[in-house]
């Protein structure tokens, strides 16, 4: 794997992981459209670790609160904001893990990795995001997250297992429909990404650990660093822009890309 290819994969993953445009969809399309070899699972795990560190750093105050509450949650007590937040995140993560395991066992996860599927999900869920963003009420703050809303957003998140859907895009869609403002919807979506990336990356990491050699580990470290930088930049810019700008620019991008992919897929 060349350094250019490695950096390209890391930057694409970093820039698209938290924007509502689907990082997995872009990474699947990269080898198909460019002719480059697939980056492999070790690099996949590495760039996800990089983006994980980025979101943890950006929302470090909220993460610290949740981590502080984990101990109380384990003891069956949810009498602090941290324990409640940790429980909400746990509940929101269960659906995607269950559905992800089912797709993996049946082989459907690989069957869905096609340009046509990505084109349709880019287009359809982009339009759904626009509809939710324009019509969704603004009646709640992230601090008023409930267990019921965490479960509902978790069900939305499970749809992100279809390539091209976008984990952040679909959870933001769900949050907007539940009444959360743009910044608060994005914040909840980003916090939900932490246990999801931890769980999926941890399982995949165990699978690929035996495959890695020192040269590959060096590439993985480089990929993680570049993914971290790109993700932190994208996350910072998006959260700032959401104070004054809607999700429409991302929707336009999704619709345009989805349309192009469908034309290519069916031509």
Curated annotation (Swiss-Prot):
The keyword Oxidoreductase is assigned to this record? no
Per the record, GO CC terms? plasma membrane
Q: How does it sit in the membrane?
A: Multi-pass membrane protein
User: Which superkingdom, per the lineage?
Assistant: Bacteria
Recorded catalytic reaction(s): these are: di-trans,octa-cis-undecaprenyl diphosphate + H2O = di-trans,octa-cis-undecaprenyl phosphate + phosphate + H(+)
Q: Please give the InterPro entries that the UniProt record associates with this protein.
A: UppP (IPR003824)
Q: What is its EC number?
A: 3.6.1.27
Q: Name one Pfam family in it.
A: BacA
Q: Name one GO molecular function term.
A: undecaprenyl-diphosphatase activity
Q: Where are the transmembrane segments?
A: 1-21, 49-69, 83-103, 111-131, 190-210, 219-239, 245-265
- One of the GO biological process terms: response to antibiotic
User: Which keywords, in A-to-Z order, does the entry hold?
Assistant: Antibiotic resistance, Cell inner membrane, Cell membrane, Cell shape, Cell wall biogenesis/degradation, Hydrolase, Membrane, Peptidoglycan synthesis, Transmembrane, Transmembrane helix
Intracellular or extracellular location(s): Cell inner membrane
What does the miscellaneous comment read? Bacitracin is thought to be involved in the inhibition of peptidoglycan synthesis by sequestering undecaprenyl diphosphate, thereby reducing the pool of lipid carrier available.
NCBIfam families listed in its UniProt record: PRK00281.2-4
- Family that this chain belongs to: Belongs to the UppP family.
What role is this protein assigned? Catalyzes the dephosphorylation of undecaprenyl diphosphate (UPP). Confers resistance to bacitracin.
The protein here is known as Undecaprenyl-diphosphatase
What gene is behind this protein?
uppP
